[in-house]
Amino acid sequence: MAGSDVDSEGPARRGGAARRPGAPGGPGSEAAAGCPEPLSTAEAPAESATLPAWMRLYFYGMHGITLDVLVSSARRFARSPDLRMLGFSSPYRCLLHSLTHFALEKVYLQQRRCPNAFVFNFLLYPSAHVGLQTLAGQALLLSLGGGAGVAVAPGALDLALQYVLALYHCQVFLKRFLRLRYGRQRRRQQQQQQQQQQQQRRGALPVPPGARVPTAAGARRRRPRGPRGAGGAPSQGLPDLPRFLFFGMHGFLDEIFFTFFFNVLGQGDGTTSGHTSLWSFFMYGSCSFVVEKLYFHLHYSRGWGTWKRVPIYVIFIYVWELSWGLGLRTCGACSWDYSHYPLNFMGLITLMYLPGWIFLSVYQDLISNVLWRVQYVPAN
């Protein structure tokens, strides 16, 4: 969504956002038990593997932007209460979050080698986290400011906040995130099983494993996606709550990137950050969650193609944006205003961003296809 009157912390006006793809003891044995890597053969699904590096980097950047927005919004609200709950971050910080958290992941995985879990969890890892985040933040300030006098040493409150975030990463986030597994070979094996079943129904010989079966002329090919649940949706993958959290964080990512590039390219005011609102988390998280359900139903149950589904997505998105805008505007919490754009309705929706919604609707389907192959393996 667009923030219309952002103060000096962010751009003065925002034209709207193509948002939404539409997201962690004791010594010895206790330290080893608390480390999720690697899973034993009994714990890990036979067809799953650790999340690929690119996927972890993607999520670390998105998660880092979410923390930036939460912290900056809380600080801004404490100074000047504003129900729009604006928060700030930037693509630069997204890249830094991806790299620093990827490095801290490697530090976290050394937990088993530390003889004392308490020392690692409350001293060693937090020290590495605070030091790396401080260095990255100072490097970003120097590179953007262009002068040696720009960087300022962090205060005691900043260091305390970084320590709390380090405990969150070690005791909560990484402890659960690193138990996610990605099913790489599931699609091919399920496709072979379906082909074998089809051949057996026709009275033909079973297909040898790994062999391809030619599709009959004129036959309609449906991409197998595994066992189906209610409404034709895949019955495997992440539960609903983690999916909602992922979509909400991705809404932050989309808004930060869009507002940053909109202000750099459109206004040229030299801004170094983008902005969003805390309400966007719930708005885009719920919107993407429902659109994903539409995708599963229209694609798997009805067999609709992409360009037949996209108009349904876009209509729903506009209705959702208008409904949230009306609700937030009544209590002075609406962070966007499209009144200065043509083809707008009540300043809450505009056809100017139709191409962006179409692109993100297609991207949403791609994300859903990836997410259903991600599984959470709980600790024994």
Swiss-Prot record:
Q: What is this protein called?
A: Transmembrane protein 229A
Does the entry feature the keyword Electron transport, yes or no? no
Q: Which residues cross the membrane?
A: 51-71, 117-137, 244-264, 278-298, 310-330, 343-363
Comp. bias (Low complexity): 190-202
InterPro entries in UniProt: Tat_dom_sf
Q: Which organism is it from?
A: Homo sapiens
**Record's keyword terms, sorted:** Membrane, Transmembrane, Transmembrane helix
Please tell me where this protein is predominantly located.
membrane
Q: What is its subcellular localisation?
A: Membrane
Q: According to the UniProt record, where is the region Disordered?
A: 1-40, 188-236
Q: Which family does it belong to?
A: Belongs to the TMEM229 family.
**Which GO CC annotations does the UniProt entry carry?**
membrane
Lipid bilayer topology: Multi-pass membrane protein
